[in-house]
């Protein structure tokens, strides 16, 4: 599709405004993420059971996953040295804080986090920066330049499904951490994975039937997306910072993509 604008997230620029979704347990790994990043989008590696191929996964799954996070990022970088590569990390998983910290230390450009609201994501990111800086300082007497590299700020994005959840996460990050998301991912009721909708809400949108193309109420969820954007706009104005909104779910065709851009989505 001609005329598509690049997606700008702070100092990151995606020439293709596409963020590949996180699909766990062996789908969103280095090959897929690297290929997307090499094509100008953002490739995401899923940390969900990422170390399942490690020989000690069943007996030492924490270390197995940590090794796999580092390795998958390294391999993705080999595919797309200058590409934008991040991680999809589910809040609901055990040791969430460890996955966040090692993802940052491995050189992630972004972390997208859902399956629950990532209320402590900024805290864990800051802990990673401090650990990195301390490690570099220990290794180098004159660490000024190295420390600057060590604390490269990773772009943080919550996944939300409603204006209410967007308001909750933005307000909490604002009050507790004096920061806001770098971008926001909106997962609609037609998205795959761990959705933030009750059965009643899915029924309300007509997304719980065997004939979704004919029952889905696009207009109703479009209204919710606009409300989410209004919430984000409030915090953009407060922080004088652009916060792109990226939509996901039920986007299959050229017309679907065009519709999302017309709503105000940037990816």
Language model segments and positions:
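Active-site entrance/lid segments in N-terminal catalytic domains of soluble metabolic enzymes
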Residues: 1-239
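Glycine-rich beta-strand-to-loop/alpha-helix junction loops that act as flexible
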Residues: 243-252
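A general structural signal for well-ordered alpha-helical packing
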Residues: 225, 254-257
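Short, catalytically relevant binding-site loops at active-site mouths
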Residues: 191, 251-254
């Amino acid at each position: 599709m001609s005329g598509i604008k690049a997606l700008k997230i702070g100092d990151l620029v995606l020439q293709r405004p596409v963020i590949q979704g996180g699909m766990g347990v062996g789908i969103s790994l280095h090959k897929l993420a690297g290929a997307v990043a090499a094509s100008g989008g953002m490739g995401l590696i899923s940390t969900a059971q990422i170390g399942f191929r490690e020989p000690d996964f069943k007996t030492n799954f924490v270390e197995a996953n940590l090794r796999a996070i580092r390795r998958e990022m390294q391999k993705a970088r080999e595919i797309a040295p200058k590409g934008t590569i991040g991680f999809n990390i589910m809040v609901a998983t055990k040791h969430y804080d460890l996955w966040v910290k090692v993802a940052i230390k491995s050189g992630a450009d972004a972390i997208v986090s859902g399956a629950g609201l990532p209320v402590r994501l900024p805290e864990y990111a800051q802990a990673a920066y401090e650990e990195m800086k301390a490690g570099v300082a220990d290794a180098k007497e004159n660490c000024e330049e190295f420390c600057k590299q060590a604390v490269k700020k990773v772009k943080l994005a919550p996944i939300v499904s409603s204006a209410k959840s967007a308001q909750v996460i933005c307000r909490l990050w604002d009050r507790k951490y004096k920061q806001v998301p770098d971008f926001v991912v909106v997962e609609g009721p037609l998205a795959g994975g761990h959705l933030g909708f009750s059965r009643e809400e899915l029924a309300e949108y007509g997304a719980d039937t065997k004939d979704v193309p004919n029952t889905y109420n696009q207009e109703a969820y479009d209204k919710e997306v606009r409300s989410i954007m209004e919430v984000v706009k409030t915090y953009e104005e407060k922080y004088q910072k652009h916060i792109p909104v990226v939509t996901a779910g039920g986007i299959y065709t050229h017309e679907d993509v065009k519709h999302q851009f017309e709503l105000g989505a940037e990816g």
